[in-house]
Regions:
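OB-fold and OB-like single-stranded nucleic-acid-recognition modules
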Residues: 1-401
Length: 401
């Protein structure tokens, strides 16, 4: 009898999930909550829900930060040390007491990336003043006093994924905020590593001219679907769960050959599971959807010909608002310079065969309650399978998936 192959443990190797926003700060009465008392415990916290107006193209993008302490004491701050050359030593992780978070004797030994960095003030010489904090609580308190509505800023942070009522949600957690430089244009960019399988490329949405791309995002959970992922406390932090998240890839309908090659090169997976890191943009509520000349109805084109509108005026009048939609649009694969000092080469961050399909079929993904015996739950949507195998469709777009 053949020995059952062990599953490969999921891990975040060469994994990135970060964002950058450049635009105007939108500060309202509800942006900050200061020294709020939790209803469930003795926890005191500060919370920031900040919108950044990244312009008509991207809209107002939300990001957040929250942190606090226990009234009864015992709050610890996790940090890491420095190496002799001053670089971060991630292998040297430890905690300091809450009351020591401003103690210079401790701060001088802590690695740079343990700090949140804020630079939204200038000195008398017009130089940016950088303030560093160990806790989100102190960051939010400082921003509450100093961040002003309309201030042009650059925000960097990490993407965090969670599950609420069976829906995957994304949070943009702030790491740093600086004044944007004069030459920096609006930006709403993210970089996200994901896992792709043969079902990831779905049937194109021909109204929006996009391919839905479903990737798996790895996030660590202590409990998932009623299952204890710490194995009774033996596994600190829990285990990684592959969360299904839908992205979009825009295509040019006028160049079918280019679209076909682009999908084949980057997204198509023939076997096993591929890991890829993509750069993309957020488009959220308030973004303006720009109309092109080809999109204009004939009656409006006639008004242009008769001189009632210029082409520019007509395009502006026909632009529509994106409403409450929240989109993550994939643009291009990430390129990273790898190798030693004498042999550095650019490398597309795409790794085929990272896992087998079976590696993602984990027992703890199934809800703990007994499933209905009359209904078998598949690891993918039945519609997805039909799309992948539907190669006889008349449309060239449909032939790509």
């Amino acid at each position: 009898m053949a020995r059952k192959k062990d599953k490969k443990a999921l891990e975040k190797k060469n994994w990135v999930q970060k964002f950058t926003l450049i635009g105007n700060a939108v500060v309202k009465d509800y942006t900050f909550k200061i020294d709020e008392h939790s209803n469930k415990s003795d926890w005191i916290y500060n919370l920031m829900n900040l919108s950044v107006d990244c312009g008509d193209r991207y809209g107002k993008i939300g990001c957040e930060l929250m942190g606090g302490y226990s009234l009864n004491g015992g709050t610890s701050i996790y940090v890491h040390g420095k190496k002799e050359d001053g670089s971060d030593d991630f292998s040297n992780q430890y905690t300091i007491d809450w009351d020591d978070r401003f103690n210079e004797d401790y701060l001088s030994d802590i690695g740079r990336s343990s700090f949140y960095r804020i630079g939204i003030e200038k000195d008398t010489n017009d130089n940016v003043v950088v303030n560093s904090f160990l806790t989100p609580y102190d960051v939010v308190a400082y921003l509450h006093e100093n961040l002003k509505d309309g201030m042009r800023i650059k925000v960097n942070g990490q993407l965090r994924y969670s599950v609420y009522q069976d829906t995957v949600q994304i949070r943009k957690e702030v790491n740093s905020i600086f004044l944007a430089k004069d030459n920096e244009e609006n930006k709403s960019e993210f970089t996200q590593t994901m896992l792709l399988d043969k079902y990831s490329v779905e049937k194109p949405d021909k109204e929006k001219n996009v391919f839905p791309i479903t990737g798996y995002i790895l996030e660590k959970f202590k409990e998932y679907n009623g299952n204890d992922l710490t194995e009774g406390g033996k596994i600190k932090g829990g285990k990684f769960v592959p969360l299904r998240k839908r992205f979009e890839y825009e295509y040019d309908v006028t160049d079918p050959e280019k679209v076909k090659k682009a999908i084949e090169k980057v997204f198509k997976v023939k076997k096993d599971v591929t890991q890829i890191t993509m750069v993309g943009v957020f488009v959220e509520g308030g973004a303006t959807v720009q109309t092109t000349e080809d999109d204009l109805p004939d009656d409006i084109k006639e008004l242009i010909e008769l001189g009632y509108y210029t082409l520019e005026q007509a395009l502006d009048a026909c632009a529509t608002n994106g409403g409450k939609e929240k989109r993550m649009i994939l643009r291009r694969p990430m390129i990273k310079i790898v190798g030693d000092e004498d042999n550095k080469v650019p490398q597309i961050q795409k790794f085929e065969g990272m896992y087998s399909d079976d590696d993602l079929m984990l027992d703890y993904l199934i809800k703990k309650e007994e499933p209905d015996e009359d209904e078998e739950e598949l690891p993918f949507d039945e519609d997805d399978e039909e799309v992948v195998e539907d190669v006889n469709d008349d449309s060239w777009l449909d032939k790509l998936v």
